[in-house]
């Protein structure tokens, strides 16, 4: 472990079970924080970057409704629905995992760096990208398959007709 980053190989016991069943799952996953995706219920939540008041209200109600089940909430730590759902999860004491489209040595968007410590208190971050990888456009679609692949269910809160959430 270097810089508090660990690596999980596809054949390791702690590699996410659901992700093992994805034909295009990554061979290696880098992680930071308290992450165990094999012993609890997991729900992925994704949506538009241009969140509306409806999306915010949905995130608040959804987390309030599922909190008694104590699931892990996975999202992309991006603008809009992603950060909204992750902040609600933290506020309600749920573990949350940010699945990133870049290396773990940075946070994108930078404005979300202030939430990184909140997530790391009871959750963490996942990525298939090396620490030096930047947030390239094509990485976001690659990341989406992991967001969906680690969970039992994926909830799309809001999305444009051709939004990236719909390929998750």
What kind of region is each of these model predictions?
Residues 3, 7-168:
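Glycine-biased, small-residue-rich flexible motifs in mid-sequence functional cores and linkers
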């Amino acid at each position: 472990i270097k810089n508090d980053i660990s690596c999980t190989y596809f054949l390791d016991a702690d590699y996410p079970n659901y992700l093992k069943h994805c034909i295009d799952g990554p061979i290696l996953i880098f992680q930071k924080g308290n992450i165990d995706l094999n012993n609890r219920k997991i729900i992925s939540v994704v949506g538009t970057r241009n969140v509306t008041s409806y999306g915010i209200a949905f995130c608040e109600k959804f987390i309030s409704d599922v909190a008694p089940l104590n699931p892990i909430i996975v999202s992309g730590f991006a603008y809009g629905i992603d950060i909204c759902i992750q902040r609600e999860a933290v506020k309600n004491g749920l573990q949350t995992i940010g699945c990133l489209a870049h290396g773990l040595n940075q946070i994108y968007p930078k404005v979300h760096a202030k939430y990184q410590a909140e997530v790391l208190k009871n959750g963490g971050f996942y990525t298939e990208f090396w620490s030096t990888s930047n947030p390239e456009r094509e990485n976001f679609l690659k990341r989406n398959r992991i967001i969906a692949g680690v969970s039992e269910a994926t909830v799309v809160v809001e999305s444009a007709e051709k939004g990236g959430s719909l390929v998750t």
